[in-house]
Amino acid sequence: EIEFQNDDREELQYSAAFTVQNPASKGRNQFVEKELRFLTTQYAEDHPQFGELCLATDADGEISYQEYWYRGGWSDSLETYWRNFTEQSTLKVRSYEEPGDRDHGTLCVRKTVPAGHSVRIRFILTWHYPNNYNYWAPEYQHIMWKNYYAVLFSNARESAAYGLANWDRLYGETKRFKDELYASSLPEAIIEAISATMSVIKTATVLRLEDGSIYGWEGLRKDAGSCEGTCTHVWNYAYVLPYLFPKLERSIRSLDYHYNQDENGRMQFRMLLPLGRP
């Protein structure tokens, strides 16, 4: 969310632009209403790398876009974009028929702000990569399951629409929690410890399986999880889930009793994926 404050004596025109690079090596970018979609043409819908991004806005100003930056050599694409943005009142449409290699696309909103007034422009970026699999165990890579958000939303456009429609509630509830935590009488060191460890549950350290159950790594490497299995010697000492989201904590215990306990009552300390794997 970007805010423009016009302190001039006359009305001014303001433009805000959001640029995204399509991560697909063979992809296409597509404008639909107030959205830019970043699609892949390389993979089938049941492939682990199939998916899309969606960049959207709910602004009521003048919307322009470039589905593609100029495909040139060296830094031609960036230089051409900057000239387009600074020298034109609105972006001129640029499209290519052939799929590209990680093309950039830009969504832009232009608004008139009266003297002494301000305006806010919202953008939201969502993704939808529905298929997950055990990439660290080759013998099980043929078994896939859905990420939980793929059960809730059928594509990135749906989650973008949800995010914009519920923006004020989601932001308000998050800010209220943050404000009350930092306004509490707890010692500063305790507040820091709570906030630092709490942030882990919104990272890729945590997965939600197809039924919504929680699965966690011990930590993360740059591009992979580190030490699988919601292991008990890490997650049994975590307090965020049981105190803030007890149903999610309970899902870990339910999985343990269903998949990790043997006929003698002994329980393994790692949950292996796919579920039910020996």
Where are these regions (language model features)?
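Acidic/polar, glycine-enriched structural segments that form the non-catalytic walls/loops
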Residues: F4-C231, L248-R250
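Helix-terminus loop motifs that line ligand-binding clefts
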Residues: N236-P278
